Amino acid sequence: LCRQAHIEHPVDHSVRIYYGGPIETQIGYVLHTPDYNFSTTEPINKWLSVTQGTDILVDIAGGTGPMQFLIVLGYCSWAPGQLELEMEAGWPRDPNSGWMSTEASGRLMFSTDSFNKWEIAIDSYATNYVDTLLKFETHT
């Protein structure tokens, strides 16, 4: 990626690059901690921002980028309302659905072990699901 973006003197570390989706796969997006801010940085919430462009890649390669980050190439897109409908019909309503959602966390987003991400997400989902069931039980 550094060679393709003509970034010189990268810091000696390996960075996993994720596939964000089939649209504009030549464009990179960096999800990162809010300790980094650039003109193209968009805050998502109090612990997560996104920045597009090569400037952040230059800073990451030079060791001056955000403390934690995740690089993705490309993105997915849905028609208006389509994603919401798919997620509403998701698990547990439809066990064959590919959608399970849970609250995002820095631990989940920035874990370096991709297999660990699944475990963290499913543990979080199960905890949230059980908590919701318990709240429902106590209010009925």
Please describe what each predicted stretch is.
Residues 1-72, 76-140:
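A short aromatic-anchored loop/beta-hairpin motif
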